[in-house]
């Protein structure tokens, strides 16, 4: 990537039928802090509402279509169900990013420029291992949104992508994103043994990649996910201080909790089922 291009991971966007209902659910169990009020946006892909929240040092964005005006959010939900829609990365200069992607045969969609000097473009999930990725050129790149002071309640650790070929996926992100820092090399999961995982820091944020191991294994959840949905974003992962209290509230409220266990290293975790969490599989680890 051009040395003059700088990037910063900004948020993961979640497509929902109702922002208010989704925010009510996530706020009940996780320490969300509003970054932006619910706002209407008009882009080349259509008009919609969005709202941002801080969670453990990272940002969740919720998006919905305008009432009675089905658009790209509704089309996404009709095809995939509610859930993670795209990853968003801020850049100081968009044009060289798009030029390199197109030169290498990547599919770039929904380009748009705004009077403010901002601009946006997306890498089609067909080119980026099932993940729709937004680049957002911001004129005030050197003056990012101030983060709230750490509250010690949560740490947003990573987004996990299910892929067929983990090395090809990691090579792709290393080629088109910056800065990139190596993380854990692909290896058989020590805690489970039924999937391969690796991670890397991409534009200041950790991405995890998971892949089925060679041969047939019991409980190959990665293969099942890809068979049903295709490659793409699998889950979000966070460390939570009030692990026990949150788990108790979820169960008391009848929210489906799955894969609750302690791994071989003594680390406790559970997942909030996407059936109750607006299509998002949420992994929760004990402690910060």
Regions found by a protein language model. Give the residues of each.
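Aromatic-anchored, glycine/proline-accented short structural segments
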Residues: 159-206
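Short secondary-structure junctions
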Residues: 30-41, 104-113, 177-188, 252-262
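N-terminal beta-strand motif that seeds the catalytic metal site of vicinal oxygen chelate
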Residues: 1-23, 84-89, 138-170, 176, ...
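An N-terminus-focused feature that recognizes amino-terminal "leader" regions
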Residues: 2-13, 20-54, 61-69
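Amphipathic alpha-helical segments
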Residues: 18-33, 95-104, 165-181, 246-253
């Amino acid at each position: 990537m051009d040395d003059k291009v700088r990037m910063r991971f900004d948020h993961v966007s979640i497509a929902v039928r109702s922002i208010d209902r989704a925010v009510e659910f996530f706020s009940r169990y996780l320490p969300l802090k509003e970054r932006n009020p619910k706002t209407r946006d008009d882009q080349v892909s259509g008009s919609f509402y969005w709202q941002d929240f801080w969670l453990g040092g990272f940002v969740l964005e919720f998006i919905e279509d305008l009432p009675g005006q089905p658009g790209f959010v509704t089309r996404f939900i009709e095809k995939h169900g509610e859930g993670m829609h795209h990853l968003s990365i801020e850049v100081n200069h968009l044009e060289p990013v798009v030029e390199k992607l197109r030169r290498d045969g990547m599919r770039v969609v929904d380009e748009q420029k705004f009077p403010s000097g901002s601009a946006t473009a997306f890498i089609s999930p067909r080119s980026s291992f099932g993940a729709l990725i937004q680049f957002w050129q911001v004129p005030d790149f050197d003056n990012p949104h101030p983060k709230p002071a750490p509250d010690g309640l949560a740490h947003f650790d990573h987004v996990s992508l299910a892929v067929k070929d983990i090395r090809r996926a990691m090579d792709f992100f290393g080629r088109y994103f910056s800065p990139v820092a190596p993380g854990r090399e692909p290896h058989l999961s020590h805690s489970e043994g039924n999937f391969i995982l690796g991670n890397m820091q991409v534009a200041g944020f950790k991405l995890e990649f998971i892949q089925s191991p060679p041969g047939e294994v019991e409980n190959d959840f990665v293969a099942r996910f890809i068979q049903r949905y295709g490659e793409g974003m699998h889950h979000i992962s966070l460390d939570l201080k009030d692990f026990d209290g949150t788990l108790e509230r979820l169960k008391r409220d009848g929210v489906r909790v799955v894969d609750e266990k302690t791994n071989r290293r003594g680390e406790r975790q559970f997942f909030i089922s996407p059936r109750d969490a607006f299509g998002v599989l949420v992994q929760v680890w004990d402690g910060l």
